[in-house]
A protein has these predicted regions:
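A nucleotide- and high-energy phosphate-metabolite-utilizing enzyme signature
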Residues: 1-452, 462-523
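Walker B beta-strand of ABC/ABC-like P-loop ATPase nucleotide-binding domains
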Residues: 455
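Catalytic glutamate of the conserved HExxH
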Residues: 458
Length: 523
């Protein structure tokens, strides 16, 4: 298994099987009954990556302490001698059930899998664990939500970081695992299928989630092999080698290397996970708090849309073919801080997939779109919702070239399109939070040009170098597509063409030169 990974899941399954056989062989001489060797955590899911810990529970029913010590030495010590990172716990039935009051132990036990020994013992413990966790699902999910928020704050809350954490980052493997655990506590069965049956995610969502998860698992195996340790961060220094291990090849030019292609695949997979998790999690936690059958959730209505538990729904009687529907959705989601519900997202995605759509641009829709961008960071989530459904590219076809596109540049933190939306959000936040910026904005007679210039400043990076030049015709096409007045279009072109002027001057010229200052001001 050392060479891999053509397929990360196959690699993990093969390595898991090797460890299973070793544990079974080691346990056989000391197993006198009422003993079970149980794989938990990632090992229980059969997702052992090269640098993963092998987490084992030695479960017993009435063994004496001395005999247990002999069993641990026989089962665990040889694996340590083989340089495996083995973590273990020894518990009886009662202890194993009580231990799930600790969140990390609970999540590990939700993925418990029999390796060898007394299967009935594990089954009885599993029933007790499920019963204990299901008594207070809100407590478990509150703790899991806090843990998820903590890890995102630590490693980054954006699914398009240029050095992503494959396990703990937004849209990472842990987000899918959290959904599986939530199903176990709320619905009594761990996995994605129970969430489909209960309506939290759709069958197409499940398929997309599995594909995205498997892509990240393959990346994680390759990253562990290249780094030589359990490092879950896909750092710049290993991206080229990881890309080759994952089967990517170089394209044409410095912006289409194997590593760029790997990162683009990762960004789109992470977005899929991030959106599915965010959409389902609000409903799952609300149902855990108030009861799935007992509660009558509070509803709000914005425009023609319904908002329940932070999830926005377009009622079935409301046509999605209205020319300004996406713009109204964007405005409503921003105003209500909501995400699209599963059915609405599916309707929109199906409409995009059907081909030609009825959504158009004119002065009112363009003004509504830009008014959302001026809301700053509040617009990022709603824009991402339209991106996930394909509506954004349907509205702006030229956006397809930058969607999920990697830019391996230490001066940037995100994918090309995410960088553009963050730049627009930064402008919106600036004028909302800083008085001097708001005053300066009042003196600008074409705010459309300013916002569009910021949004489109790097659009040329998908079309060759120098990107400040290649971006000009693309920006012009987009402005004309949006129906911008010619004067606005010209100003956007100029902003795109000269967006590197000030940073270049600031880093290469004498800023005390009065003549230089006048020259730049005239430009």
């Amino acid at each position: 298994v050392a060479d891999g990974p053509a397929d990360g899941r196959e690699w993990c399954a093969a390595w898991t099987a090797v460890v299973d056989r070793a544990l079974t062989s080691l346990a056989a001489p000391v197993d006198d009954g009422n003993l079970a060797v149980v794989a938990v955590g990632g090992y229980g899911r059969q997702e052992l990556c090269p640098g993963s810990d092998v987490d084992v529970l030695i479960l017993h029913d009435g063994w004496e302490e001395a005999a247990l010590q002999d069993a641990v030495q026989a089962i665990v010590y040889p694996l340590w001698d083989a340089s495996l990172k083995v973590g273990y716990a020894v518990r009886n039935r009662k202890e194993a059930v009580a231990a799930v009051d600790d969140l990390d132990t609970a999540t590990a036990m939700l993925d418990a899998r029999m390796v060898c020994g007394d299967a009935g013992l594990l089954r009885r413990v599993g029933d007790g664990v499920t019963q204990r966790l299901r008594k207070r699902p809100a407590r478990f999910l509150d703790a899991l939500t806090a843990k998820d928020d903590e890890r995102r704050a630590k490693v980054g809350a954006a699914a398009e970081a240029l050095e992503p954490d494959l396990k703990n980052g937004a849209g990472g493997l842990r987000d899918v695992q959290s959904l599986r655990w939530a199903a176990g506590v709320l619905l009594g069965e761990v996995g994605l299928d129970p969430l489909v049956a209960a309506g939290y995610i759709g069958a197409p969502d499940r398929s997309r989630l599995v594909r995205a998860y498997d892509a990240l698992l393959t990346e994680r195996v390759a990253t562990h092999l290249e780094s030589g340790r359990g490092n879950d961060a896909l750092r710049f220094d290993v991206q080229d080698a990881v890309a080759r291990r994952c089967g990517f090849e170089d394209g044409d030019g410095d912006r289409d290397t194997a590593a760029h292609r790997l990162l683009s695949e990762h960004f789109l997979a992470a977005r899929t996970i991030d959106h599915a998790h965010g959409r389902a999690w609000r409903l799952i936690t609300a149902d855990a708090t108030t009861g799935r059958r007992r509660r009558r959730p509070a509803q709000a209505r914005i425009d023609q849309f319904e908002v329940v538990d932070g999830v926005l729904r377009v009622p079935d009687l409301v046509s999605i073919d209205h020319p300004d529907l996406p713009h109204r959705l964007l405005h409503a989601m921003t105003r209500s801080e909501s995400v699209l519900d599963r059915r609405t997202a599916t309707r929109l995605r199906n409409r995009v997939d059907a081909g030609e759509h009825p959504w158009t641009w004119d002065h009112p829709t363009r003004a509504q779109f830009l008014s959302v961008l001026w809301r700053g960071s509040a617009a990022l989530g709603p824009v991402a919702e339209l991106d996930d459904t394909g509506v954004l590219v349907a509205l702006i076809p030229q956006w397809a070239a930058v969607r999920g596109r990697a830019q391996r540049n230490p001066f940037h933190r995100y994918s090309l399109d995410r960088h553009a939306w963050h730049a627009a959000a930064a402008l919106g936040d600036l004028v909302r939070d800083e008085t001097w910026a708001a005053v300066a904005l009042e003196r600008i007679d074409d705010r459309e040009a300013l916002m569009l210039g910021v949004l489109l400043h790097d659009i040329g990076k998908a079309h060759g170098e120098p990107h400040s030049q290649t971006g000009v015709p693309v920006a012009r096409d987009i402005c004309e597509h949006l129906g911008c007045p010619p004067r606005t279009t010209e100003r956007v072109e100029r902003l795109v063409e000269h967006h590197l002027l000030l940073p270049d001057i600031a880093t290469r010229r004498d800023l005390s030169d009065a003549a230089l200052i006048i020259k730049i001001a005239e430009q």
